[in-house]
């Protein structure tokens, strides 16, 4: 027994080394069971948790903006993404490979505050401080429409998920507007008392939901042309709104340093706030920090002024990730439509794309 133990002793530290070298050979395509042992040779190069996405590396840095980056969104097909900000440019990037910036959309005379792809990804909508909303062909990069009518900064825009291509906008002029991109002027306008910082549609696109500096979230009925109900609870300006993919719940981010989930189904109880999340912060910069849902609704993410990316578990309300790396406020975090990947846009002029388990 003693001799056996002695014999085993020095072998133990050598085993992993041998196995690693063997797998490298298999990864290169030699050996009988090459395909079984190793799917991707690249997975051996990283010394960390196993890879869970098709990104070239677990974290990719996207640099090219010349000013603060306010917004970022993945294309619905997941192969490209768009980002925009203070430099008045919209940059289009490849998600896979070297993440090259393959196109730049120009034409704004003010910062780009928010952007969204429509459901099929054929169009990109963007809102700007030059008081306009632009509609771009996401394939060619051409601007196909410019919507004018607001008298101050347009802080937010959101395209309808289904039906005719409608888009809603919210502005510092205190109005929420509804546009049909086939028409020149807004087809409906709702007058709010204070600046509107964030807007979205409900799932059926017959209501617009808005948030602003009066701390309230308002739901406007497009058929009856009036305010339907108001959701109160935030103690400071609401800077971001996002509807869950199945359309039942609304996520809001506000300067009171809370992120909330609201039940926006018809006939929901009067107290619609169902969850409160804490962990992200706003600061004196008063940037419009946005928020987003993962495609399956199991996670939420929000921008934060403490230079970290916050991702929560929706059910337990636990912070799953507080990711460092940026040198400025994180203004938006977006989830990839298919893979466990997030992208963050920051005031440090950079974007980080990384995989999360």
Swiss-Prot record:
Top-level taxon in the UniProt lineage: Eukaryota
Residue positions where Asymmetric dimethylarginine is found in the record: 21
Main localization, broad class: nucleus
Subcellular location: Nucleus
InterPro entries xref list: G-protein_beta_WD-40_rep, U5_snRNP_Component, WD40/YVTN_repeat-like_dom_sf, WD40_repeat_CS, WD40_repeat_dom_sf, WD40_rpt
Pfam families: WD40 (PF00400)
Keyword line: Isopeptide bond, Methylation, mRNA processing, mRNA splicing, Nucleus, Repeat, Spliceosome, Ubl conjugation, WD repeat
WD repeats: from-to residues: 64-103, 107-146, 149-189, 191-230, 233-272, 283-322, 325-357
Acyltransferase keyword on record: no
Cross-link (Glycyl lysine isopeptide (Lys-Gly) (interchain with G-Cter in SUMO2)): 18, 270
Gene3D superfamilies per record: YVTN repeat-like/Quinoprotein amine dehydrogenase
Gene Ontology terms, MF aspect: RNA binding
Function noted in UniProt: Required for pre-mRNA splicing as component of the activated spliceosome. Component of the U5 small nuclear ribonucleoprotein (snRNP) complex and the U4/U6-U5 tri-snRNP complex, building blocks of the spliceosome. As a component of the minor spliceosome, involved in the splicing of U12-type introns in pre-mRNAs.
Subunit structure of this chain's protein: Component of the pre-catalytic and catalytic spliceosome complexes. Component of the postcatalytic spliceosome P complex. Part of the U5 snRNP complex. Interacts with PRPF8. Component of the U4/U6-U5 tri-snRNP complex composed of the U4, U6 and U5 snRNAs and at least PRPF3, PRPF4, PRPF6, PRPF8, PRPF31, SNRNP200, TXNL4A, WDR57, SNRNP40, DDX23, CD2BP2, PPIH, SNU13, EFTUD2, SART1 and USP39. Component of the minor spliceosome, which splices U12-type introns.
PANTHER family: U5 SMALL NUCLEAR RIBONUCLEOPROTEIN 40 KDA PROTEIN
Full protein name: U5 small nuclear ribonucleoprotein 40 kDa protein
Originating gene: SNRNP40
């Amino acid at each position: 027994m003693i001799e056996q133990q002695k014999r085993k002793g020095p072998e133990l530290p050598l085993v992993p080394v041998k196995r690693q070298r063997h797998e490298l050979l298999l990864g290169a395509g030699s050996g009988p069971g090459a395909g079984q042992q190793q799917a991707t040779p690249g997975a051996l190069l990283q010394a960390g948790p196993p890879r869970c996405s098709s990104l070239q590396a677990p974290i990719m840095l996207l640099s090219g903006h010349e000013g603060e980056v306010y917004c970022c969104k993945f294309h619905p097909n997941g192969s490209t993404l768009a980002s925009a900000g203070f430099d008045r440019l919209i940059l289009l990037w490849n998600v896979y490979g070297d993440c090259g910036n393959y196109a730049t959309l120009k034409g704004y005379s003010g910062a780009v505050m928010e952007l969204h792809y429509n459901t099929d990804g054929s169009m990109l909508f963007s809102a700007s401080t030059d008081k306009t909303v632009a509609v771009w062909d996401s394939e060619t990069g051409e601007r196909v429409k410019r919507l004018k009518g607001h008298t101050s900064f347009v802080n937010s825009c959101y395209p309808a998920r289904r039906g005719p291509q409608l888009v809603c906008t919210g502005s510092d002029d205190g109005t929420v507007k509804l546009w049909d991109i086939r028409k020149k002027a807004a087809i409906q306008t709702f007058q709010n008392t204070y600046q509107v910082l964030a807007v979205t549609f409900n799932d059926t696109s017959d209501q617009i939901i808005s948030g602003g500096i009066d701390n309230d979230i308002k739901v406007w009925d497009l058929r009856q042309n009036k305010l339907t109900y108001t959701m109160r609870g935030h103690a400071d300006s609401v800077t971001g709104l996002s509807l869950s993919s199945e359309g039942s719940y609304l996520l809001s981010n506000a300067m009171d340093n809370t992120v909330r989930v609201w039940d926006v189904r018809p006939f929901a109880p009067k107290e619609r706030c169902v969850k409160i999340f804490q962990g992200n912060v706003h600061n004196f910069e008063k940037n419009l920090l946005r928020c987003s849902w993962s495609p399956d609704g199991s996670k939420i993410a929000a921008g934060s002024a403490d230079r970290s990316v916050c991702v929560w578990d929706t059910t337990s309300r636990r912070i799953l990730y507080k990711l460092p790396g940026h040198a400025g406020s994180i203004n938006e975090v977006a989830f990839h439509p298919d893979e466990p990947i997030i992208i963050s846009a920051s005031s440090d002029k950079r974007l980080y794309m990384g995989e999360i388990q």
